[in-house]
Amino acid sequence: MERNMAGKLFSLRNVALLALSLSAASAYAVDVTVAYQTSAEPAKVAQAENSFAKRSGATVDWRKFDSGSSVLRALASGDVQIGNIGSSPLAVAASQKLPIEVFLIASQLGSSEALVVKNDIKSPQDLIGKRIAVPFISTTHYSLLASLKHWGIKPEQVKILNLQPPAIAAAWQRGDIDGAYVWAPVVNELAKQGKVLTDSAQVGEWGSPTLDVWVVRKDFAEKHPDVVTAFAASALQAQKAYLAAPEQWLKDPSHLSTLARLSGVPEAQVPELVKGNRYLPVADQVAQLGQPVDKAIRDTAEFLKQQGKIPQVDSDYSAYVTDRFVKQVQAAPQS
């Protein structure tokens, strides 16, 4: 009888402890909405495998956006806590004092973003008077303006139209535009019927490099630093496998199908797009998330001010960049 009673008390105690642990887990659970775009990068494997949620214990809602400007609006409203944007919208956000900070570099952009034009445009000078579409306040907008400056063409000599990528694809098919500076998957569709006049790798060599970055709302980062660190860790871990053996990684059918699905491009085009950008391991992330990214924001802001896109340029943008989360990843045993 005493053994039965002791057994019952033991069982009740276990049930109580289990209930308390479940209650604590529920209280700790964090809801986070992540804004992603359609770039084809190795870290998207982490998204597909849900490794961020597994590492953090958070409930994650991944939402696809067509451009950085739309991501900024979602970040500003609080609908999104973590978002993927380019260095141009980042400069705009910092100039507008949006309370966000860069915590991870997704990629240094190269041939994955390009200016594609109709085949009758033979040289940059043929752009004068033509209709060129681009999503305003995007990395490609910045790269287009930088290209025109390099070629000695004033922006007002070209009819620059503000269109989102899906609208660019439709306008191209209708014959409403003569070209567009855009990214995957639309850039791939345009290139089937047109030709690449320049790309962001070339523009970077001309002195106007661009980045894709991950940013987080500062209030969310302060409340949930472990969640942000888990995001950085999951992305860098997925990327690490690619950097260790790029060609072998790109031969894995599961990688190709994952990136094709999340980026909207055919599997056959994935390798070229992935190789078109540069991805930074954790040590390089730590080195870049400081003065280099601060300078990139400032240089971009200065250019955008010259073009009349923002009213002023600050002398210091370090408040919008942090390396503390990638340093946590670097310090962890698994890194």
What positions do the PLM features span?
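Bacterial N-terminal signal peptides that target proteins for export
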Residues: 2-16
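Cleavable N-terminal signal peptides
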Residues: 16-17, 27
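Sec/Tat signal peptide C-region and signal peptidase I cleavage site
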Residues: 23-29
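Short, glycine-/small- and polar/acidic-enriched structural segments
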Residues: 30-162, 178-184, 195, 200, ...
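Short, solvent-exposed loop/beta-turn-alpha elements that line the ligand-binding surface or hinge
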Residues: 54-57, 202-206, 282-291
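Pocket-lining segment of extracytoplasmic ligand-binding domains
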Residues: 88, 161, 167-262
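Secondary-structure end/capping motifs
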Residues: 222-309
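Conserved C-terminal helix/tail region of periplasmic/extracytoplasmic solute-binding proteins
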Residues: 294-335
